UniProtKB/Swiss-Prot annotation:
Cofactor note as given: Mg(2+). Can also accept Mn(2+).
Transmembrane segments: none
Gene that this sequence comes from: ackA
GO terms for MF: acetate kinase activity; ATP binding; magnesium ion binding
Residues that bind substrate: 89
Protein name according to UniProt: Acetate kinase
Binding locations of ATP: 15, 206-210, 283-285, 331-335
Sequence similarity: Belongs to the acetokinase family.
UniProt site (Transition state stabilizer): 178, 239
């Protein structure tokens, strides 16, 4: 019996899902949180049960050991030998990786080298890879890159309008992110629409704590909102999205606690977006509650958020010369009907119309009116399944 674990590692977390392959059956899922902090928590979901335990988990290697022990303890597996593949989500693959790759020491070093492109993510991915190599040295490890799907972008879309030597010598360009999600929901959208993806023009909107919009032409990414790093694009939960780059030296020169570029980038990554503007939360549910309570900062944060998403969708309607569908996915994309309504309401000139009842009560499929010139879909993303499939493909 072949089992594959799909891993999404963060700096202090390890999210996982165990699949029976090739049947694609989810056997168990879980998350280990607060790695390296006090009161680490391991949560396992299996057979309709959910169990959590507070443990001492100082690093990712210990986290991996606990994950595997949990699988045995709860009789989810009978022996480690049943695990035949580990798939790792990797945010930044740069130009090294145009598709998923079997991991050796060389690949780990290259992923680590690309940490500047995803400083919040790649170091954690490397830590998880090394942990699995230490604990299960004989098992195949595969890296699945968020950036791989976007390698089809044309040069005029991925190059910045700066001297080309900065691309040729330093690889400064747009790489994008969330590619695994955009790939999955585009193909699922084609199924919902009952048309081959090779005929479709789609705008996919991955709206979670991170936000990215992608223009998909006939199954390929031709432009996307995240850039050299996942900091670019629309406003996000704690990330600013696009700002005038001249703001950075201005803040360094004038704000005492922002001593250098690293301080400013940290602020833009972790203290901005919905959290920074509202002053109290990066969670859209809290922002909506703040709006109900007539909090002006919550209203402002929400309005900026909606405005930035509409602008990117408008850009990509122009890039694609129209679209067959707009697809909402990820945490907010799937679960925030007010946000979807307000985004689409600003696109009515394009003949895009939501069915208000379907928008509120439908959680999958077409939520637009019969008259809408562009379909509006809600599709649940499943990056873990794509990762498991890639492991199976590379075995």
């Amino acid at each position: 019996m072949s089992k594959t674990i799909a891993i999404n590692a963060g700096s202090s977390s390890l999210k996982w899902q165990l699949y029976q392959m090739p049947e694609e059956t989810v056997l168990a899922a879980g998350i280990i949180e607060r790695i390296g902090l006090n009161d680490s928590i391991s949560t396992v979901k299996y057979d309709g049960k959910k169990e959590s335990e507070v443990l001492d988990i100082p690093n990712h290697t210990v986290a991996v050991k606990i994950l595997l022990e949990d699988l045995l303890k709860h009789n989810i597996i009978a022996a480690y030998e049943e695990i035949t593949g580990i798939g790792h989500r990797v945010v930044a693959g740069g130009e090294y990786f145009k598709e998923s790759a079997v991991i050796s020491q060389q690949e780990i070093e290259q992923i680590e080298e690309l940490s500047a492109l995803a400083p919040l993510h790649n170091p954690a991915h490397v830590a998880a890879m090394r942990a699995f190599e230490e604990v299960l040295p004989e098992v195949l490890n595969v890296a699945v890159f968020d950036t791989a799907f976007h390698t089809t972008m044309p040069k005029h879309a991925y190059l910045y309008p700066i001297p080309q030597k900065y691309y040729t010598d330093y690889k400064v360009r747009k790489y994008g992110a969330h590619g695994t999600s955009h790939y999955y929901v585009a193909h699922e959208a084609a199924k919902v629409l009952g048309r081959p993806i090779e005929e479709l023009k789609l705008i996919t909107a991955h709206i979670g704590n991170g936000v990215s919009i992608t223009a998909n032409y006939h199954g390929e990414s031709v432009d996307t909102s995240m850039g050299f790093t996942p900091l670019a694009g629309p406003m996000m939960g704690t990330r600013s999205g696009d700002i005038d780059p001249a703001i950075i030296p201005y803040l360094i020169a004038n704000v005492e606690e922002l001593k250098d570029a690293a301080d400013v980038v940290n602020m833009l990554n972790k203290q901005s977006g919905l959290f920074g503007v509202s002053g109290f939360s990066s969670d859209m549910r809290d922002i909506e509650a703040g709006i109900q309570a007539h909090n002006p900062d919550a209203v402002l944060a929400y309005n900026i958020f909606i405005d930035r998403i509409k602008k990117f969708i408008g850009q990509y309607l122009a890039v694609l010369n129209g679209a067959d569908a707009i697809v909402f996915t990820a945490g907010m994309g799937e679960n925030a009907p007010l946000m979807r309504n307000d985004v689409v309401e600003g696109l009515s000139w394009f003949g895009i119309e939501l069915d208000l009842e379907k928008n509120v009560f439908g959680n999958y499929g077409d939520i637009s009116t019969a008259e809408s010139k562009v379909r509006v879909l809600v599709i649940s993303t499943d990056e873990e399944l794509v990762i498991a499939r890639e492991v199976e493909r590379l075995k």
